[in-house]
């Protein structure tokens, strides 16, 4: 039997899988939204998918750019403006920022080494262990991916393609071979 990976190496592998999985889920939801749906507020106090994408792109870029060497709240970030859509915030531009921010995450996570866990990083001037900073970002990402999927499902209704196990299909799913359990992501309407 092979030796187990040290905790830090195993954890970094899981972080890579988690961020890629969250992005895959969000992308699977976003592809189901028409341009109108992308900008549609579900209610007066909630955010539309476009606002969530803009905010997540800003947050991920800020937290992960120069992750080990600069504060996670970059001076050029304006968090409040991430929730304000302007005519310049086309779907194509927001999705470009989305892709760029996730590339920053993927590149920085890939560059982390187990010995980096001895370092401390700051977010808004507050010290965080590497573990705390990564967990904070994973939690924030999962939270907003869930919002994107909920908004999408709310707007698309019966036209929504479920990205996990559909209601009433758990037994059928559990009976499948693990290699056959992949959920096919929908194409954009």
Where are these regions (language model features)?
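C-terminal ligand-sensing/allosteric alpha-helical core of TetR-family HTH transcriptional regulators
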Residues: 59, 63, 97, 101-108
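A short, structured beta-strand-centered segment in the mid-to-C-terminal lobe
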Residues: 86-100
């Amino acid at each position: 039997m092979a030796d187990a990976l040290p905790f830090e190496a195993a954890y970094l592998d899981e972080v890579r899988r988690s961020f890629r999985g969250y992005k895959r889920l969000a992308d699977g939801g976003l592809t189901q939204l028409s341009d109108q749906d992308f900008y549609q507020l579900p209610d007066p106090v909630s955010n539309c998918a476009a606002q969530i994408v803009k905010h997540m792109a800003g947050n991920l870029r800020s937290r992960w750019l120069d992750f080990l060497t600069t504060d996670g709240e970059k001076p050029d970030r304006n968090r409040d403006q991430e929730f304000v859509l302007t005519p310049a915030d086309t779907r194509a531009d927001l999705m470009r920022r989305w892709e760029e921010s996730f590339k920053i995450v993927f590149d920085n996570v890939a560059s982390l080494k187990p010995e980096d866990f001895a370092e401390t990083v700051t977010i808004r001037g507050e010290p965080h262990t590497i573990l705390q900073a990564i967990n904070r970002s994973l939690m924030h990402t999962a939270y907003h991916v869930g919002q994107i999927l909920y908004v999408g499902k709310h707007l698309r209704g019966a036209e929504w393609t479920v990205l996990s196990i559909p209601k009433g299909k758990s037994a059928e799913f559990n009976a499948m071979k693990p290699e056959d359990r992949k959920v096919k992501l929908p194409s954009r309407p």
